[in-house]
Design a protein with these regions (language model features):
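Edge beta-strand at a domain terminus
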Residues: 58, 102-117
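Short, surface-exposed linear segments at secondary-structure transitions and domain or protein termini
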Residues: 69, 93-100, 114-117
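Sec-dependent N-terminal signal peptides
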Residues: 3-14
């Protein structure tokens, strides 16, 4: 019985792991091979979001009711600072890219080709 309870506690994280993994363009002409720099791309890999000069661990995923979206506690560090934010992430149904919503900001990123990184 205890093993079953542990399995159910771990299962939601395993189901969501890798759901948004990929490399995404910051702009239409962004270089997909340059991750984390201005003019380059962003990456989500193994529940870590790599942005420009920063990275965030995507923790405590919660599926948003009646939406194909996930809410994360983002534990971020970069440029000699650390902070926490909440962010909602979902796949872009039109382009196959990513939509990321932070408090007051929404971003839409196109996915780079699979062989970009």
């Amino acid at each position: 019985m205890i093993r079953l309870a542990i399995a159910f506690a771990v299962l939601p994280g395993l189901v969501l792991a890798g759901l948004f993994d990929g490399v995404y363009k910051q702009t239409a002409n962004a270089e997909c091979f340059l991750v984390g720099v201005d003019g380059g791309s962003l990456q989500i890999k193994d529940d870590i979001f790599y942005g420009v000069g920063m990275e965030c661990r995507m923790a405590s995923p919660v599926q948003v009711v009646d939406m194909e979206a996930t809410l994360y506690n983002m534990q971020c560090a970069g440029e000699d600072a650390a902070w926490s934010e909440r962010a909602m992430v979902m796949n872009d149904k039109e382009s196959g890219g990513l939509i990321m919503i932070w408090n007051g900001y929404a971003f839409r990123y196109d996915r780079c080709a699979d062989d970009a990184n």
